[in-house]
Amino acid sequence: MKENSCTACSRRLALFVGAAVLVVGCSSKTDVTLNRDKPLVFFNRQPSDPLTGKVDMAAMNWNDKTYYVGFDAKFGGSIQGKMILDFLASSESSVDRNGDGIIGYVLCIGDVGHNDSKVRTEGIRRALGTWTGSSDPGQAKEGQAVVGGKSYKVVELEGKAMTGTDGSTWNTNSATESMGSWVAKFADKIDLVISNNDGMAMGCLQASNYPRGLPIFGYDANADAVESVGKGELTGTVSQNVDAQAVAVLQIIRNLLDGSSGEDVVANGISRPDAHGNKISAPVQYWEDVKAIMADNSEVTSANWKEYTRGARDAGVRQVSAPTKKVLLTVHNASNDFLASAYLPALKHYAPLLNVDLTVVQGDGQNELSCLDKFTNLDMFDAFAVNMVKTNSGADYTDKLKY
């Protein structure tokens, strides 16, 4: 065979005892897609600088098939803040438990380096007038709110990042322990408990000395949290429309693998019907500057909690007839309440409808290698969906996709 007679050949050298065998297989260049050219969708944790929150555009511009799917976190923080203000405005003076004219609150912070945690804390503090320009613990000033037509001072008694003994953030056990300490320290000075997510809020409720009826607000609309709202235990939470996010992750991949380009990638089946008539029902937006699909948020209270109960899926997404594609998906923490109880079940519900064969690998929530070490056999997959442990780890994944 002449050297140039099979320019698209791949050559692999197999060594055997006492012999070397040259294996030559010919295939068309168009038959092979390099990993670096495959769709890559980051989700739930936007590639970004953990200190400044600036989006990591090097990761987002890895290739022209790289996108992020999340939710409008800043708007969500505002929704949570407004929900708390509305609650106070409609409350009686007895919400001030010790009658000192001050609404005191404690704050469970998820992760000081996480964009979602930052903007949720900002939304809360802006609404209550305690915002100083920083989302860090201890950085709050005296604010003001109206309770039953009367103005009250608002004080953040303490804000704390809930980090577990294993280093994991957004930690439920840490929230339980902290709540117990807060009750012992502040007693009836605590008028509200506010949390960056439902997992920590539910952890607070598990404290043995949690004051019965003390108002508490979470975020995520996890199934157990929504049920808790219905029981009158949790005062309110915020839905980030996880079904819309899960469908968007899969739909973008489906669009790219089906050959869509340009606006069709981020619109078909998302903001307008695709060829199968599918379209996400909840409001979503495309932020072109950061290549992100963002779902809207909504508050969940005693007035509407039944609309968010488990099992309500998007009727706008139905079975498609497209070829099955294989996708490797990472989850940063197998123990994360939101991902385990809401996001993954949604992904697993919609993936078969879009003929996406998901392989899910899960990490421990603290060490990126717990995901990266399972981010293997990449040639077997048509696309990748990545939920990182740390928001600045985008390059760790794209480095593995170079070839």
Curated annotation (Swiss-Prot):
Signal sequence region: 1-25
Keywords for this protein: Cell membrane, Lipoprotein, Membrane, Palmitate, Signal, Sugar transport, Transport
Lipid tethering residues (N-palmitoyl cysteine): C26
UniProt subcellular location: Cell membrane
Domain of life of the native organism: Bacteria
Tagged with keyword Membrane: yes
SUPFAM superfamilies (UniProt xref): Periplasmic binding protein-like I
InterPro entries associated with the record: Bact_Solute-Bind_Prot2 (IPR050555), MglB-2_Peripla_BP (IPR040740), Peripla_BP_I (IPR028082), SBP_2_dom (IPR025997)
Family as reported in the entry's similarity comment: Belongs to the bacterial solute-binding protein 2 family.
Free-text function comment from the UniProt entry: May be involved in the transport of sugars. May have a role in chemotaxis.
Protein's UniProt name: Glucose/galactose-binding lipoprotein
